[in-house]
Design a protein with these regions (language model features):
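Short, hydrophobic/aromatic-rich beta-strand segments within well-structured domains
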Residues: 76-78, 99, 111
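Specificity-determining recognition surfaces
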Residues: 1-25
Length: 114
């Protein structure tokens, strides 16, 4: 899938199939975020893959809006360095890279927060 096509067709998914996502697809999703440009190459982020069902259920109870998080095969928690002046915008760029990479892999996603 071309980047432009992914941008034009991506959807915010709120219902997930109960099938596992291959580890190599998860790796590509995280790698796309890691390779995203950041202000002064600070890379003020950490990515935490959550694929434990009990943890996903707990996570779904605290994210806004996010009950559907409990249905997902995995989630990625993004932590940023609050001292970075562009941490939020840099992390936002990385998240968008993950969303588009997942979509190009045939994997739906949704961006939530708390």
């Amino acid at each position: 899938m071309e980047v432009y096509e992914a941008i034009c067709t991506v959807l915010a998914v709120r219902e997930f199939q109960s099938k596992p996502v291959p580890d190599n697809a998860i790796h590509r999703i995280i790698e796309s975020a890691r390779l995203t440009a950041s202000s002064m190459n600070r890379q003020p982020w950490n990515f935490i893959v959550v694929n434990n069902r009990d943890t996903l259920i707990k996570l779904g109870s605290v994210v806004t809006p996010g009950p559907y998080t409990a249905q997902a095969a995995f989630a990625v928690a993004v932590a940023i360095d609050k001292s970075s002046p562009f941490g939020i915008s840099d992390a936002s760029r990385a998240i968008q890279s993950m969303v588009l990479t997942a979509w190009s892999e045939g994997i739906g996603s949704n961006w939530t927060g708390w």
